[in-house]
Every structure is written in structure tokens, then in C-alpha cells.
Amino acid sequence: MTDQHLEDLIVHIVTPLVDHPDDIRVIREETDQKIALRLSVHKSDTGKVIGKQGRTAKAIRTAVFAAGVQSSKKVQFEIFD
């Protein structure tokens, strides 16, 4: 799965969870050893993306890591507001 596919996967997962889908941003920072994906959503949607006790965020992170396992680089995923 390519880097762009990882970004598309995140957007596809997060879009139904938020009230402001136009404010979804996935920022990719890539080095020789890792791909860092940072998700930004509207301030009022942050809690929805994180979920109770972080369960939703953990599920998103698990899906992203599973999709990125074919990459030779380590995949890092963060949510920020």
C-alpha cells in the first residue's frame, strides 16, 4: 500500500465519524526510516475521533499500522488539534 493510500484510508475511516469532513487534514512527513501521518480535524470533532478512553483512535491506529505493514518503513500515526 502506497503512502497516498494510507492517507486515503485515514480519511475514509474518519469521514463518517465527524461533523465537519471538510476540515479533515492528513499531513505526511517521510524520512528514510519512517512515515509519520498526522491527522487534524475540526476542534469540535477531536473527541469523536479519539473516542471513549481512546478506543476509536486505537482502532484507527491499528488499521493504519496493518495497512502499512507492507512498507519497509515504520508507520507512525498521531491525532492533533
Swiss-Prot record:
One of its GO terms (cellular component) is cytoplasm. Its main location: cytoplasm. GO terms for biological process: cell wall organization; peptidoglycan biosynthetic process; regulation of cell shape. It comes from the Bacteria. Residues 34-81 form the KH domain. It is found in: Cytoplasm. InterPro entries: KH_dom-like_a/b, KH_sf_prok-type, KhpA. Disulfide bonds: none annotated. It holds the Pfam family KH_KhpA-B. One of its GO terms (molecular function) is RNA binding. Keywords: Cell shape, Cell wall biogenesis/degradation, Chaperone, Cytoplasm, RNA-binding. PANTHER family: RNA-BINDING PROTEIN KHPA, UPF0109 PROTEIN SCO5592. Forms a complex with KhpB. A probable RNA chaperone. Forms a complex with KhpB which binds to cellular RNA and controls its expression. Plays a role in peptidoglycan (PG) homeostasis and cell length regulation. Belongs to the KhpA RNA-binding protein family. This is RNA-binding protein KhpA.
